[in-house]
């Protein structure tokens, strides 16, 4: 079985309704009880944090491995727990500032960022130094799809062999796993 030096995971976090009523014109639907809903039907199956933590990612990782874990504002604290459960130590947080800015989902402040948490086990690879941790990158047309920019960036700084978990398409020189692609790995 291949042990991976780089793993990218974009878990299908489970979302629900978002908070209290607002006079904001951004609120899509206000219910008689004062609650408002900014929820929408997510076009894929989701998983609870417990289910995500239970995945055997540690068994796929090389003794020297970097994990890039996508998360949103809502799941940021849980993402750190997932990192630990999978056997990785936190290193850095990379930020995708979505452009153009939209309304985001929920909260007083509409989050228009997503985070790519870098975790590591073992030794860091000798790599190119990148002089920033945030990027303004155009939004993709599909919900939750990440810009190719980040995969290209990861290929620049992190070693092969590489695995993308919860992948949506095949990518040259990567193994993939997920229910939207023909998986090249069993979990």
Where are these regions (language model features)?
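Class I S-adenosyl-L-methionine-dependent methyltransferase catalytic core
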Residues: 1-187
């Amino acid at each position: 079985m291949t042990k991976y030096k780089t793993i990218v995971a974009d878990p299908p976090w489970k979302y629900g309704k978002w908070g209290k009523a607002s006079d904001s014109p951004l609120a899509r639907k206000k219910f008689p009880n004062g609650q408002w809903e900014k929820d929408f039907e997510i076009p894929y199956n989701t998983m609870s944090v417990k289910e995500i933590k239970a995945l055997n990612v540690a068994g796929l990782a090389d003794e020297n491995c970097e994990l890039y874990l996508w998360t949103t504002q809502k799941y940021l604290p849980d993402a750190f727990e997932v990192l630990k459960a999978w056997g990785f130590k936190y290193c850095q947080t990379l930020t995708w500032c979505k452009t153009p800015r939209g309304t985001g989902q929920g909260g007083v402040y509409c989050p228009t960022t997503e985070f790519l948490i870098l975790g590591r086990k073992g030794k860091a690879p000798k790599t190119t130094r990148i002089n920033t941790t945030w990027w303004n990158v155009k939004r993709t047309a599909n919900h939750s799809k990440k810009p190719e920019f980040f995969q290209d960036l990861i290929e620049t700084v992190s070693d092969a062999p590489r695995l993308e978990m919860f992948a949506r398409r095949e990518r040259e020189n990567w193994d993939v796993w997920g229910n939207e692609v023909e998986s090249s790995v069993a979990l």
